Amino acid sequence: MSMAASSSTATVQPSGIITQPPPPSTLREQRIATHSHIKGLGLADDGTAMSSSQGFIGQILAREALGLHLSLLKGGKYSGRPLLLVGPPGTGKTALALALSQELGSKVPFCAMVGSEVYSGEVKKTEVLGSCFRRAIGLRIKETKEVYEGEVTELTPSEAENPLSGYGKTISHVIVGLKTVKGTKQLRLDPSVYESIQKERVVVGDVIYIEANTGAVKRVGRSDAYASEYDLEAEEYVPLPKGDVHKRKELVQDVTLHDLDMANARPQGGQDIMSVMGQLVKGGRTEVTDKLRREINKVVDRYIEQGVAELVPGVLFIDEVHMLDMECFTYLNRALESPMSPYVVLASNRGISTIRGTEYDGVAGSASEGIRAPHGLPVDLLDRCMIVKTQLYTRDEIRRIVEMRCKVEGIAISSEAVDKLADEGERSSLRYALQLLTPAGIVSKNKGKGEVGVADVEELGELFLDAKRSAGVLRSTEDFEKRY
């Protein structure tokens, strides 16, 4: 009965083949985030910003400024000079930083953080900032290895008498035959390599490669000459390797300095019970010492001088940078002058505000107003920055953004409803207008309509208040709260 029930959803094709639908666990759903539509800065070849390109609408001057910044980044001429994005909330500062990361590509490290992330009870604030700096600095290691690659045609271990035992025998060496399109070669390998071959479960007909320096063995797959050997087999078939059996391969590995820090900050303890228990009890985050980082920097410098590695400065994006305090700003000033410094992009939506960490004058812990500065940043850090201002979106730009988000989210909407959402975005904020999109699609679907109408948007406007209307409601109830 269970078999009949499970096959009820199967589809019978005209050819007579029964196809089963894929299980739900294998179906991939693409999540739609706030900035899913951003694919780049949307610049022309001459560096001018197009009105609507690569998912970006508006912010012409800011995009052109970031385009110049991008040219300096790619030319390696912009270290130590951070970029500061300032503007009201909801004007696309985070979207600009993400577009910059899209333009740089996946090979360039991009580390995004929020200013409030530095406050932790386990790790110092400067340590959190330092680890983010190291995450944004990549190291491209190029290594040339000599390997033997081919299809296994012979695998013969040779035994010899064990001198330590009167009866047992040991493996003295192993004969391995490898075949490629160009020729064959027979290798005589050490017994330790035979152990690696056994761990990989290599048999005749498998395609393997053996590193000449380390003796490491890697099974690539089964030769496609044996593909018709079985009707059903959970095996990956690969073609016969081309070229000679003995060849040189250039391997490129991309790591960050933070990866090297973590690999060296966690030494492997002993295998006794006390070491194991100590590793289990020890919790929290590992703090990397400055001494260890200096040693790693020396090794990295040596690799760069030898031509083995190449330094790839990435981008560190600190959103809500006004949430940092004076200690963090002092650390930032020093870190920006370091020769191993990434490109730093800051963002703030504050005007003249108090610098965090300056509210106390130090006299018996008494509070003071603190130091007020533009964007909540010290003047010495502001002097280092190149500042880019973002503008509020116009009604036409809000309308085009709403239309684009409807296409991304797959929501059918009428032109009148788009105009209504554009009015709401101009009156309150762009975020409020975009937040009404998905609920409006659900409301219209529940009503059995094919597209979102003006009535659906008005209904949601009554259900969900924007920030301005909510503040107005609170002001109207102040007298009531004072009386009771």
From Swiss-Prot:
Domain of life of the native organism: Eukaryota
Disordered as annotated region, ranges: 1-27
The record's top EC class is hydrolase
Record InterPro entries: AAA+_ATPase (IPR003593), P-loop_NTPase (IPR027417), RuvB-like (IPR027238), RuvB-like_C (IPR041048), RuvBL1/2_DNA/RNA_bd_dom (IPR042487), TIP49_P-loop (IPR010339)
Listed GO biological process terms: box C/D snoRNP assembly; chromatin remodeling; DNA repair; regulation of transcription by RNA polymerase II
Chain intervals with Low complexity compositional bias: 1-11
Mind telling me what this protein is named?
Answer: RuvB-like helicase 1
Q: Which gene encodes it?
A: RVB1
